[in-house]
Amino acid sequence: MDDNLSGEEEDYYYSSDQESLNGIDNDESVSIPVSSRSNTVKVITKESLLAAQREDLRRVMELLSVKEHHARTLLIHYRWDVEKLFAVLVEKGKDSLFSGAGVTLLENQSCDSSVSGSSSMMSCDICVEDVPGYQLTRMDCGHSFCNNCWTGHFTVKINEGQSKRIICMAHKCNAICDEDVVRALVSKSQPDLAEKFDRFLLESYIEDNKMVKWCPSTPHCGNAIRVEDDELCEVECSCGLQFCFSCSSQAHSPCSCVMWELWRKKCFDESETVNWITVHTKPCPKCHKPVEKNGGCNLVTCLCRQSFCWLCGEATGRDHTWARISGHSCGRFQEDKEKQMERAKRDLKRYMHYHNRYKAHIDSSKLEAKLSNNISKKVSISEKRELQLKDFSWATNGLHRLFRSRRVLSYSYPFAFYMFGDELFKDEMSSEEREIKQNLFEDQQQQLEANVEKLSKFLEEPFDQFADDKVMQIRIQVINLSVAVDTLCENMYECIENDLLGSLQLGIHNITPYRSNGIERASDFYSSQNSKEAVGQSSDCGWTSRLDQALESGKSEDTSCSSGKRARIDESYRNSQTTLLDLNLPAEAIERK
């Protein structure tokens, strides 16, 4: 124990050990609270889905002075991107905005969609029958048809899954039908279909919105997640599931989404099984089934009773001596087969190298998850002892830092497998450049791995049984290592983003930025709305005055909003307490089966 705690023998990767000790007497120096700024990730439940949708509808309705179904049509067309909708309005004008989305507004339009309140007979251009005027319905585009034809048209479109954009029946008319009219006509004959129509419109806020996605939990929790800033992020739903918002897979940074999808398939499909069969077996020349040699003799007999030479794979007779095999002599060296076999062996060995280390850290994470209860017990016992040290938050902070850094370390191996292999970037880097980058990355990875293991070791120490001096030494080591692994994780991400992926021509391999506080937990949408109303801040980000000027002048305006995304409202978190780091275990450790 004393050897492990010797400061002279430990060589931690940190720019200045003394700097990390300056605040030792104050545990706030290592307590890493969740950021006090407004939460940028919201969880939308079934109850708050309608409120979330109405928030965007209200903004468009107020700024454009249009009905709700017109605002919905515009938002669906622009995938519920309010800022993009406003930008098109400023750049191209109101007419272009409406025509592109299929919205038609008639001057002096009556609120009543019926053609006439009288019983005078009028002809329907679809069924070519004369019906009373009150049985004809006119849409915003001015086209009118009988209610039976409209109802049949709406029924077909809803059943075909086109509820979000039901266009007028008139020839070459692309106007979107009024959802109130659709609902009113369909509900008279098929109330269930009307409910289906409303459900499609409601879920459009999630299905068509790139900033909102369903939680991929199984069984489904019923929640959706909305992000305010960048869709390239990792989030945690209120149900506890952590996932990548970009691809809806488990959180996998520093792997890109493409890398993780390839790795996941490689681990679960039969690709490596095929490699093993290629390396360790040979096909029978008669039945073509793979045969594994279980002895030293090169004359092999398949279950189908066919004998063949193990060296070249050619069929032979069954008799042989030490000098020759009956009916066979090996031919010339076949270079292609040998190269193929050697390549398969090399690829299998390389895959097993990265997979074994990835799996080892995943297994370590599962074992370290049990440390949470042990740490709590040791802290509880230590607080009851008469020790000089009264605050043991350093142990909890160190445990959370261990979980976070172990997750990063686990997924760094799949990243390295594809980054320095031939599958993705063979033509992007020369062999010399690949070697330099690989050495740079592996140095970072090795330093992180060494410090993570040291941190894990010190947290497992029974400090609840030690005297004051040893507890203080463990505390210093845990604090130093917590700072060190956080710095190393940040450096690794910077290395990946700038030195590795940043120099490549392909821009599809983006990674989620490193968050020292861990994966962001989604806050409730209702609470954020209440906070917004309490603060009384506008979420229009300056668009209102600019749009008024654009609509009045009718000219395009080259301006930009101070926020490229939805505006955020700062919250004080007055009723919340300062919390510690997120308990970010690898997804395998928290995956619901």
From Swiss-Prot:
Zn(2+) 6 binds at C309, C312, H320, C330. Zn(2+) 4 binds at C244, C247, H252, C257. PROSITE patterns: TRIAD, ZF_RING_2. Binds 4 Zn(2+) ions per subunit. Its cofactor is Zn(2+). Keywords: Metal-binding, Repeat, Transferase, Ubl conjugation pathway, Zinc, Zinc-finger. Coiled coil: none annotated. Zn(2+) 2 binds at C141, H143, C168, C173. CDD domains: BRcat_RBR_ANKIB1, Rcat_RBR_ARI1-like, RING-HC_RBR_TRIAD1. Belongs to the RBR family. Ariadne subfamily. Might act as an E3 ubiquitin-protein ligase, or as part of E3 complex, which accepts ubiquitin from specific E2 ubiquitin-conjugating enzymes and then transfers it to substrates. This is Probable E3 ubiquitin-protein ligase ARI2. It comes from Arabidopsis thaliana.
